């Protein structure tokens, strides 16, 4: 989901200590958790977490985990419709604004402001309606990805999703480095905490007293450091794993990759704005998605920025479709339903 991006952006409000938690948490907690869950599933024939709980903890625990898993997976799937629909709506309005010819494609900020003010419509639809349309499209995709075999949809489009994710990660690193070296508009790494002493590296920079570093930092940045949701997805990957030797790269390595993405966006949060209060103001004005959009457009231009934002969009989409799919499999296994044909 958007956790490895939105979480680190919010976590940046606590200062550079957020990056320390991402590194330590990812290596010693998140990746270990994912590898452990994945290997449990691999060595039990791709069994789901409820089945594993039943095997090792008994039938009552299995029944409880079944209900809990289905409820939480459905909630996750629903939640991961809103954020990609919002970003896709913004992209659509801005692209149509540039295509209309009335606004220069090089002036991404002007396009965005006009679209937000309602000065741009898409086939007569304002931005709110466009977001609703994208919500419907994403839901339809989720249904198809849930019902059809993995190789029919998920297996075919995920390579493109992966390419967008790679472009987003490399592009934002390039943007940070090039901005740091720029003479026209320099943006130094961690400029919001530049010149601090070593002791202050562990200081809580969050100004609101009701948001202490412990334990809220660890709740703010979960995906990218440690995510229990990954345990529900392990069986999907375990059933596609041909050899146990692949497990370390698939389960442990994937979490390390997620941690790198989290570090990139935490660095954006610490660097893009002049100060942490400015970052907080941007988040209040439009949620972390505003930070994602504004920084991507600034570093990579309208076209490159849109591709970077699409790299962000694929994260909640790939979590939403697999969440619904995992819920379907849990229900089918619980009721011993045959899953060999589409009708079933």
Each PLM stretch: what is its role?
Residues 3-9, 45, 72-87, 219-240, ...:
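Membrane-helix boundary/coupling elements in multi-pass transport proteins
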Residues 7-11, 16, 32-61, 96, ...:
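Flexible loop linkers connecting adjacent transmembrane helices
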Residues 49, 148-162, 229-262, 278-292, ...:
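Hydrophobic, small-residue-rich membrane helices and short re-entrant helix-turn-helix hairpins
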Residues 59-66, 70-71, 128-137, 253-263, ...:
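Loop-to-transmembrane helix boundary motifs in multi-pass membrane proteins
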Residues 65-72, 92-149, 165-168, 339-344:
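Transmembrane alpha-helical segments of multi-pass small-molecule transport proteins
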Residues 69, 73-78, 162-179, 227, ...:
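Selective recognition of specific alpha-helical transmembrane segments in multi-pass small-molecule
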Residues 77-98, 104-108, 132-133, 145-146, ...:
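Hydrophobic alpha-helical segments and their helix-loop junctions in multi-pass secondary transporters
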Residues 176-200, 254-294:
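Extracellular/periplasmic helix-exit of transmembrane alpha-helices
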């Amino acid at each position: 989901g958007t956790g490895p991006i939105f979480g680190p952006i919010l976590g940046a409000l606590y200062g550079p200590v957020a990056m320390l938690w991402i590194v330590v948490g990812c290596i010693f907690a998140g990746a270990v958790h994912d590898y452990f869950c994945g290997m449990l599933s691999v060595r039990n024939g791709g069994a789901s977490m409820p089945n594993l709980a039943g095997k090792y903890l008994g039938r009552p625990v299995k029944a409880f985990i079944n209900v809990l898993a289905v409820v939480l997976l459905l909630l996750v799937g629903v939640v991961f419709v809103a954020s990609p629909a919002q970003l896709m709506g913004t992209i659509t309005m801005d692209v149509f604004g540039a295509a209309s010819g009335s606004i220069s494609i090089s002036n991404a900020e002007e396009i965005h402001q006009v679209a937000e003010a309602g000065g741009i419509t898409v086939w007569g639809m304002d931005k709110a309606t466009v977001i609703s349309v994208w919500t419907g499209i994403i839901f339809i995709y989720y249904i198809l990805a849930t019902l059809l075999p993995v190789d029919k949809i998920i297996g075919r489009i995920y390579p493109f999703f992966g390419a967008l994710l790679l472009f987003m990660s490399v592009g934002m690193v390039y943007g940070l480095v090039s901005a740091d070296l720029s003479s026209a508009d320099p943006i130094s790494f961690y400029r919001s905490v530049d010149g601090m002493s070593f002791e202050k590296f562990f200081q809580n920079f969050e100004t609101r007293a009701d948001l202490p570093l412990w334990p809220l930092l660890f709740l703010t940045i979960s995906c990218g450091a440690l995510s229990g949701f990954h345990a529900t997805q392990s069986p999907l990957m375990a059933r596609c794993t041909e050899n146990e030797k692949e497990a370390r790269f698939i389960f442990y390595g994937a979490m390390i990759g997620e941690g790198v993405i989290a570090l990139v966006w935490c660095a954006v949060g610490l660097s893009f704005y002049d100060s942490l209060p400015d970052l907080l103001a941007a988040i209040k004005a439009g949620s972390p998605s505003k930070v994602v959009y504004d920084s991507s457009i600034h570093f990579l231009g309208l076209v490159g920025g849109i591709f970077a934002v699409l790299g962000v969009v694929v994260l909640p989409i790939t979590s939403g479709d697999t969440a619904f799919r995992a819920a379907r499999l849990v229900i089918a296994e619980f009721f011993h339903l045959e899953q060999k044909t589409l009708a079933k």
